[in-house]
Amino acid sequence: MSKNSEFINLSFLLDHEKEMILGVLKRDEYLKKVEDKRIRKLKNELLEAKRRSGKTQQEASRVCVHCHRNLGLIFDRGDPCQACSLRVCRECRVAGPNGSWKCTVCDKIAQLRIITGEWFFEEKAKRFKQVNVLGTDVVRQSILRRSPGAEEVQSQEQTRQDAEKSDTSPVAGKKASHDGPKRKGFLLSKFRSATRGEIITPKTDTGRSYSLDLDGQHFRSLKSPPGSDRGSTGSSDLNDQEPGPRTPKSSRSNGVTPGTQSSPAPSTRTVTSVISREYGFENSMDLAAIEGTSQELTKSHRRNTSGTPSIAVSGTSLSSDQSRSELDLSESFTEDSEDTVSIRSKSVPGALDKDSLEETEESIDALVSSQLSTNTHRLASGLSTTSLNSMMSVYSETGDYGNVKVSGEILLHISYCYKTGGLYIFVKNCRNLAIGDEKKQRTDAYVKSYLLPDKSRNNKRKTKIRTGTNPEFNETLKYTISHTQLETRTLQLSVWHYDRFGRNSFLGEVEIPFDSWNFENPTDEWFVLQPKVEFAPDIGLQYKGELTVVLRYIPPEENLMLPPEQLQGNKTFKKGKKKESPVISGGILEVFIKEAKNLTAVKSGGTSDSFVKGYLLPDDSKATKHKTLVIKKSVNPQWNHTFMFSGIHPQDIKNVCLELTIWDKEAFSSNIFLGGVRLNSGSGVSHGKNVDWMDSQGEEQRLWQKMANNPGTPFEGVLMLRSSMGKCRL
């Protein structure tokens, strides 16, 4: 919010009134995070139900697609669901009105739209103009911003107070100079604590104050020091401001000394001053004085400035206390799946490899392909799109060079410190590991860890190399991350045999999700090492957000009604005889890219700079590529952009595939894949050939069929983004 028109004038509010409003806004922010967490949990439950149900059943199979119960030939044959057309048994049905019924998964999808309140936001979007700025943000920044005439008013107030203080004793002046930073520290600590979700109450008569830690869900009570003017806030942030005669930065920037700014001298505004002092404020300028300190808080109210440990490994970045997953992707981003040499090269088959020679965004993929062309097949399981930062990581993720059979266990002690935000993985030892080097009959093992889905170099931790099949490590791998963020992560620990020539051998791995992990009673626990999963069914089911699109197919007999400038084609400015525009036969596929929700945040401020790229397969040439504009600093972008593909006959609908992928725009590195969808008939066949990109299921397939069966009618659909654009295996 950089425009002045987005601020409202709240200068008439008293100090304690502003404090009360800010407290309400902080509670509102906390409730929003709780609601986002609830919605994310519901959607993860739906994805888990889909995963348990399996993929689309074959025609010859007589098994319930959800519970896998055997169906009979005559009795209890099962019936296809009226929504998804999958055959289910009687136990997996949910009856509806008028004798209709749905399978359990389809019913859960329908209920999810109601439970999460999506219907309300959809109706709101139809009635009111969509804006990217929330009302709470406008009020918060209006309170925190300095009014245009604040400095003039403040200078006049200082002059008047200096005249009144001329008769006071030096002791009183010294006390006032000490009192200013104290009150300033109290005000700043209020904002810091409120950002963490703590509700702070004023000091009571007994000298004790209570604060509710909303993240930890427990009460804390701290005794306020005797004679403290700031009271007790239950937060260690009180120690951040050392009382003393030195001038704070905020005061120096405004040309005001602490003594004059927060002097307890008598004033004509006695009632206001008394009320303000009860809540830790001296005058209305205290709110504006922290503007320089809380500049980042003003720009993003979810940015934590209290010193809460950062999610990013870099110590210079501030943490984001959102409930959604914010990834530290300043260096790179990978998805460890069998389907990706490069996420983009598999996402749009063949197209991005061609584009990489012409566009900066795919240059790293071309470099990877050229350098590792001889080992492309072996690198397919783990090569990152931007893993050139650490070639050692590339080789260690490429697979099992020694064909070692995985065996053994690893002993871990996992703990979390809520006060510092530190995750501690104490790697004690391993036992019964496989032999890494068969010729020398030795194993030089080390342990490597990631907090998935972030597989960047900054997110990697490694132990030292130990010799033997029962190595003793006794090392602690530490991550700094807030608890709300930790609930969205999965710890991946892998054991490797070190080879001096870089041909490391994979010895096993363990994945530990933290969404339901109990950190209250940490204990030592043995984990069995597992082989690397070649076909990872869960990779495609990770919740990456949603994309809202509107599809419409305009048949050939209606496309001549459109003006020529709406048809697909590039304008030319070459001199010479003007060429006639070719007559385009066939219909037009109109794709309206509306918006996306809950995208993965990859920037340090908890946002992304996202855009959508579209292809109509099998034509994956650069000429047919469509892109939207980049929407910056948002995880809920609204593009409202239309893609138009021409020359499509009705019989082509069942042979083509619309692929839409969302990317985060990076200035000096490869763009980061955020998710994608494919819309097609789901037959697996295109023009008589078996292809891996005709793999749509569920809502993707249903939306495509609706469009094909009703030419000329637009259909809107909300599609869950895939976390990997590899083929969905049956």
Curated annotation (Swiss-Prot):
Biased composition (Polar residues): 248-271, 305-322
Protein name according to UniProt: Synaptotagmin-like protein 5
Region (Disordered): 147-188, 217-271, 294-355
Keywords, alphabetical: Membrane, Metal-binding, Phosphoprotein, Repeat, Zinc, Zinc-finger
GO function terms (MF aspect): neurexin family protein binding; phospholipid binding; small GTPase binding; zinc ion binding
Gene3D superfamilies in alphabetical order: C2 domain, Zinc/RING finger domain, C3HC4 (zinc finger)
Tissue: Highly expressed in placenta and liver.
GO annotations of cellular component type: exocytic vesicle; plasma membrane
Phosphoserine PTM positions: S147
Any Pfam family the entry gives: C2
Domain RabBD stretches: 7-123
Major location category of this protein: membrane
Mapped zinc finger ranges (FYVE-type): 64-106
